[in-house]
Structure formats: C-alpha cells, structure tokens
Amino acid sequence: MAEIGLRLGADVPFFLRGHNAWVEGIGENITPLTGDTQLAAADFLVVKPPAGLPTDAIFSAADLKRDTEAATMRGFAANAYGFGHNDLQPVAQRLCPGVTQALNWLETHQLQGRMTGSGSAVFAQVQHALDLAKVQESAPEHWQVRLCSNLGVHPLAGWATA
C-alpha cells in the first residue's frame, strides 16, 4: 500500500504508517521517532487563507532553492518545533499573498508561523494561553483557523496492515 501511496504523493506513505517519523528521499525512507527522538505533545494554531496554492507551481518555480544542506534526525530532535525552515515558503509567499498575510497575522498573536508543507496553510506552535474564540474572531473573513494538537500515534494506526 505504501508503494501505491508514494505514487499519489510523497507524504502518503508517512500518513499510512500513522506514527511520528523522520522522512527522507521522496517519502520512501521512513524512520519512526521513538525514545529520545519522540516528539513532545504540543498545540498548534493552523491557518488556511482562502486562496489555494498548486504544488506543481511551487516545484516548477525557477527561484525555488534546491541545494539546501541535508538535515539530520538528531538535529531535528534537539529542537523539533523550532527546527529548520521550509524552502518552499519564499516561493509560496511570492505566488500567494495570503501566505504572507497569514504569517503576519500569526505574528500579531505573538506566534512564529511557517508553512505546513507546499500549500497555503501555515501553522505556529502555541506556547502560551490563547483565547481561541477571540483569535478566530480576529481572523480575516473566509480564513480557516483551528487549534490542533499533535498525535504520537494516529488512532487508526495499523488499520492498513491488518
């Protein structure tokens, strides 16, 4: 099933596994995060502006940085929620002003945002008390704003292997 999933998208095999993992290559090399690399529980504010952003537009952009030094799992584990950057973000911000607007909006709530992947959604770890209703009310019209918590293991993990 993971091989079929890989043809659908690089993140599909990861989601089929249902566990936090370090993923390399184009999604085919998956190492579960366990022990000292396991992610701590955390809350996140996820913001989706109304405009979408086609993945192929980002990956075909001439200004996409393609020579970033490889990251390591140990480096990630040392500061998982502050680790690294998303090379897709500058291109996404150029192609979709809503990405920049959402990042700036998060900053008004003292949150450090970054892109979730290759789409227009952004997220920020919430490390302080947050009045969710007030925050959602302050969002521009048609934005989706959700408070989410990470999962160490998805509740349906293992269903695809049974």
Language model regions located:
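Residue-level marker of motif borders
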Residues: 6, 112-113
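Glycine-rich beta-strand-to-loop/alpha-helix junction loops that act as flexible
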Residues: 115-120
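Conserved, helical-rich catalytic subdomain that frames metal- and/or nucleotide-binding sites
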Residues: 17, 22-112, 127-162
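Short beta-strand->loop micro-motif that forms the acidic, two-metal-ion catalytic signature
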Residues: 121-127
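Conserved post-catalytic alpha-helical subdomain immediately downstream of the catalytic base
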Residues: 1-21
